[in-house]
Amino acid sequence: MSDTELPPAAQPDLFPEQEDEVVATREPLTARRVAIVGVRLVAGVVGLGVATVTIAASVLLPLPTVSSTPPSTLVTPVPTAQQQVCPGAVLRLADDTGQGATTSSALGVPTTSSASSSGSVTRSPLQQSDASTGGTAAAPVVISTPPNAADPAEVILLSGAQSQQVNEGDFVGLAAATCSAVSADSWLVGGSTAVGRTTLLTLSNPTEVPATVDLELFGENGAITAPGTSGIVVPASGQRVLSLAGFAPDVVSPVVHVTSTGGQVTAELQQSTVRGLEPGGLDIVGATVAPATDVVIPGLRVDDLASVQTLLVGGAGFADLQTVLRLYAPGEGTVSTTISVIPEDGVGTGTSFPYEFDAGRVAEVPITDLESGNYTVRIVADTPTLAAVRVSNAAPAATADTPAATDFAWLTAAVPLTSTAQLTVATGPSPLLHIANPTTAAVSMTLTAAGGEGTIVELPAGASTSLPVEGGETYTLSGYDTLYAAVSLAGDGMIARYSAQPSGAGSDPIRVYR
């Protein structure tokens, strides 16, 4: 290396023309080098193809699956007794001297009948009550029947009903009610707190834990806000009795929504009416069905129509003897309905008409121009709706100058019966079983008295009928897909009615996965 020659690492950058000279001196490509390059390219392409095929295969070809059945056990829940609560005695908001207007007391003792398909029914009164009836014959009664231990899935049928004819001072009339299962959510449609009308709310808790109850109240002017409607404690095996006027005074058309936590309850309204110095009847109003778009009310019994009409025309304060349909729909907006009044067996004058009302406000629709007879009322609405009918009865001697005994009943909507059901007929005058079939198919049902032979009843589509039954007896209804039923009692200046209840469920096995 000369003194002026730089080492390779220190060679200066070449100008473009010098690069061309360098390139010209590089070793030219030979056939062997071309072949090596070609093989490498082919190998790369083949590798890429293999990768592509592998990916496609993983997507398109089924992958092997591994499955196993998780361990499980078929468990039959411990069967529990069927249980219902009968409301107990008719109550008044005072003691037996007429004093103590903030307390309640019983007016006699109801007659209660009950039966079970197992043949065993236990009765026990609630042990506490605001009406001081705890542990007595006037208290609400819990009826229960044990399950079939050998077959827990068997549905045990249980039913009960009570009635009470009262004739004491301002309280005159007939009240009847079914015994009902407890619920955490129920609606009451009926009653009034207008002048001369007293309505009590009764809450019965047959469970072993206290129930905390909240109330929502609605009237003809909408929702009603009042202190004391939340956090109402109903003790275990206890009854609370509350004056509805304490929450909603001067309300003509109340509707009450009852919800509970902890223990579950049954809820009823008890209404009594006094017109001046004349008693105007009484009733026990049970819970109705939840809001629905198709509501069926069987058992509208129109008797002694001439006496009622005489009082309506000439007597002051008798306006609420008029048969009326009470409607309420939760929410907002306009509710469109079609109201149909259908005579039983095609006897009587029916009617059907459209009606609109505001959701969130209680509406009342007079039902006029009915002849004496029995009817089913049906409401088809575009919004889930609650409904009940008030009907009155007057003794034949009633006139505007000398009014005889009058009575009224609130007819709650019936629950659809979709399987074999049992009902007990309360004791009282001229009991009738009302059956309605609002469906589009004919129904053939069998009515069987306890220990008796069955009677087949054919009911065409859209028809209803009534059958005489025996007070205090229990009947089984079977052989149908869907129907509605109610029991009514009526005499001179007396009327009562209640809906049949569906059967309770058995203890079906359930599968538990571990």
Write out the residue ranges for each language-model feature:
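Conserved functional hotspot residues at active sites or interaction interfaces
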Residues: 34-51, 56-99, 163-202, 268-330, ...
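Short acidic, flexible loop segments centered on an aromatic residue
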Residues: 203-223, 260-261, 318-348, 380-381, ...
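Hydrophobic, ordered structural segments
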Residues: 130-173, 202, 206-207, 233-283, ...
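A charged, solvent-exposed segment within the mature domains of Sec-exported extracytoplasmic proteins
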Residues: 183-228, 233-240
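Terminal targeting segments of Actinobacterial cell-envelope proteins
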Residues: 1-39
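Intrinsically disordered, low-complexity Pro/Gly/Ser/Thr-rich segments with frequent PxxP/GP/PP motifs
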Residues: 126-128, 134-136, 222-255, 346-374, ...
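Extracytoplasmic/periplasmic/luminal assembly and interaction segments
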Residues: 92-138
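Extended, compositionally biased repeat/scaffold regions that form elongated interaction surfaces
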Residues: 178, 260, 283, 294-331, ...
